[in-house]
Curated annotation (Swiss-Prot):
This is Glutamate--tRNA ligase. It is found in: Cytoplasm. ATP binds at residue 274. It comes from the Bacteria.
């Protein structure tokens, strides 16, 4: 029997600059969305937007033991929260429905039948133990992997295996020559002949593997650019060979262009694990990252707008993003830098927008109810501008302004605030109370003038120490939003009540 060759792709149709860009994001619904996964989605989405192309969102859910609907819903929630939208895919539909692999099994069976008929795939009956035994008998390392033994079984051998009740896996026949492709990020890459054995595409129970369904879906959906993590680089020669075969049998129209994005490293120069708390997208959201800040930072994990420009908008990202500019070197996830960039984007928010984004965090801290009262609305409107310039994460807001929402008798004084109090605390508080009691116009300027006169001028306390006891009495903290403005929000009666309560 003459087996077909898929080694020569020189004359195969290729993606050109004129080919409309079609990229995809195709996660498995396992676990919680993590930084590396979202960076991949972001780069695909940005490239589609930059080129006026199409972003396809499909789900690879052929592993029933690991996949879950909860993870699927989390993927949808993650992309929607970040504002990463898709033209085709789950929930949206499109010309290549369905977009969940578990609903496309009949399509894969048809393709497998064509691959078998054309000789690009074959049945393999060897068990792992038999493969190892053959390696040992030949003096080879038993862990070398599959030895291509079943490539050309006779009809009699196949019949004998079937008589034993064996169910075959299906393997793709790898060419006996180098496999070379050009990576958008890494340039030309070659895998030497013989370095990759014939590989399984269908399990013995008939269920398809990622090695089959991923390139088949790319072919059927007309994907032009495969942009994914570096961890999948080693699987690319297998996919190149399979796509060549798919072109030969009329399933694929062209070979997509591959681009492998750099690893994201965590602490200690180790690859950032999806189980690392810093990698968990929803934990980052819970801490108070906003989409604008997080997208900006994730863009920097392998790409940059310019050498001296770390802060940019999503619109600027779309305008300038090109996969060819992505660096091959590993990118390090620096949580401190991420927080700083997030803080810059918080300061860029419109005041009303910022105020509205604080509400879920205040609600989570039980400072406000499901519906804000008129007084809570008033406090938030006046307090938000005091902290917008001072926080890097929305999650820092509740602790910073919680004292404004509490009853006067519910202020807990932090330990570090107590430690800095002067020995003549009672005297200082009495002077402050007397000075404030006399203030008729309850404004920040009047409050500051009265306290400065009583504590700095009259008592001789250094300015940087003078107002600490008042701050602690009013807020319970050593550090708070601007003191005098906070006292205006509380009102005269509440401010004095807190000073009296703290004095005891």
């Amino acid at each position: 029997m003459t087996t077909p060759s898929v080694s020569n792709a020189v004359s195969s149709p290729a993606v050109t600059a004129e080919t409309p860009v079609r990229v995809r994001f195709c996660p498995s619904p396992t676990g919680t969305p993590h930084v590396g996964l979202i960076r991949t989605a972001l780069f695909n989405w940005a490239y589609a937007r930059h080129t006026q192309g199409t972003f396809v969102f499909r789900i690879e859910d052929t592993d029933a033991a690991r996949d879950s609907e909860e993870s699927y819903e989390q993927l949808l929630e993650a992309l929607k929260w970040l504002g990463i939208s898709w033209e085709e895919g789950v929930e949206t539909g499109g010309p290549h429905e369905p977009y969940r692999q578990s609903q496309r099994l009949d399509l894969y069976k048809d393709v497998v039948a064509k691959l078998l008929e054309a000789g690009y795939a074959y049945e393999c009956y060897s068990s792992p133990e038999e493969v190892e035994a053959r390696h040992r008998a030949a003096g080879r390392d038993p862990k070398l992997g599959y030895d291509n033994f079943d490539r050309n079984l006779s009809a009699e051998q196949v019949a004998a295996f079937k008589a034993e009740g064996r169910e075959p896996v299906l393997r793709v026949r790898m060419p006996d020559e180098d496999v070379t492709f050009t990576d958008m990020v890494r340039g030309e890459i070659t895998f030497k002949a013989g370095s990759i054995p014939d590989y399984v595409i269908v399990r013995a129970d008939g269920s398809p593997l990622y090695t089959l369904v991923n390139p088949v879906d790319d072919a059927l959906m007309g994907i032009t650019h495969v942009l994914r993590g570096e961890d999948l680089l080693s699987s690319t020669p297998r996919q190149v060979v399979l796509i060549r075969a798919l072109m030969e049998i009329g399933v694929a129209s062209y070979m997509p262009v591959f681009g492998h994005l750099p690893y994201v490293m965590g602490e200690g120069n180790k690859k950032l694990s999806k189980r690392d708390p810093q990698s968990n997208l929803f934990l980052l959201r819970d801490r108070g990252f906003i989409p604008e800040g997080l997208l900006n930072y994730l863009s920097l994990l392998g790409w940059s707008l310019s050498a001296d420009e770390d802060i940019f908008t999503v619109e600027q990202l779309i305008e300038h993003f090109d996969v060819h500019d992505v660096l091959a070197n590993p990118a390090r996830f620096d949580i401190k830098k991420a927080e700083a960039i997030n803080g810059t984007h918080i300061r860029m928010l419109d005041a009303d927008d910022f105020r509205g984004r604080l509400v879920p965090y205040l609600r989570a801290a039980n400072l406000v109810g499901e519906t804000l009262t008129a007084r809570e609305e008033e406090i938030l409107t006046e307090a938000a501008p005091l902290i917008q310039e001072r926080i890097a994460l929305l999650g820092e807001a509740p602790e910073m302004i919680s004292f404004l929402f509490k009853n006067d008798d519910a202020i807990d004084v932090a330990d570090d605030a107590r430690k800095g109090l002067p020995e003549n605390l009672t005297e200082v508080l009495d002077a402050a109370i007397a000075a404030l009691d006399a203030v008729a116009d309850w404004s920040a300027e009047s409050i500051q003038t009265a306290l400065k006169q009583a504590l700095v001028e009259d008592m001789g306390i250094k300015p940087r120490l003078a107002f600490g006891p008042v701050r602690t009495a009013v807020s319970g903290r050593r550090i708070s939003p601007p003191l005098f403005e906070s006292m205006v929000i509380l009102g005269k009666a509440s401010s004095l009540a807190r000073l009296h309560a703290f004095r005891g």
